A protein has these predicted regions:
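Targeting-peptide/extracellular-domain and disordered-appendage signature
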Residues: 1-170
Length: 170
């Protein structure tokens, strides 16, 4: 358990909730924009635990063009984070620094990421939070996987194929 928590300090994009059973939230934000800019989506996989220990995992979907939001709730046990790298699975949905695979009721497909522009880090400032990365029990942790990257792949959204080749993400 302690290794997992220390690893999360030096790899801020990784899951931070090891050993925590209540009053915790963590989510990751993936923005994708098609090359023609006709489609813009954000996907937020995450987990939430309330003060009583009630837990859930989720994937929130934001449509930046239609200005809509969908919330897909999952059992907490469907949430499977890696203990050594950024790799989060929620049932058949997968999010990593290389790609995301979606298997939601109205959105299915795979988007791969290339030429990631990462946040610079060092021993004393392992991520965007700087020295605050070392403060235990923060209410919120922030980590940047990529500030800009290329996309390849497509999604089937409401039975329509949407191409994200040569699109942009962050």
């Amino acid at each position: 358990m302690i290794f997992k928590r220390i690893n999360a300090v030096f790899n801020p994009e990784c899951y931070h909730g090891w050993g925590i059973n209540k009053r915790f939230f963590e989510g990751w934000y993936f923005k994708i924009i098609s090359s023609d800019q006709n489609f813009a989506y954000a996907f937020i996989p995450g987990i939430a635990m309330d003060k009583n220990g009630k837990k859930q995992s989720f994937i929130q979907v934001l449509d930046g063009k239609k200005l809509t939001s969908d919330y897909h709730k999952f059992n907490f046990n469907d949430f499977k984070p890696s203990s050594y790298s950024f790799d989060v699975k929620i049932l058949n949905n997968k999010f990593s620094d290389q790609n995301m695979i979606l298997d939601l009721p109205n959105i299915k497909g795979k988007i791969s990421f290339g030429d990631l522009f990462r946040w610079p880090s060092n021993l004393f400032s392992p991520g965007i939070m700087g020295p605050y990365s070392f403060v235990p029990f923060m209410e919120c942790y922030h980590g940047i996987i990529s500030m800009n990257h290329n996309l390849s792949g497509s999604l089937k959204i409401n039975n329509k194929d949407v191409n994200f080749n040569n699109g942009k993400g962050y």
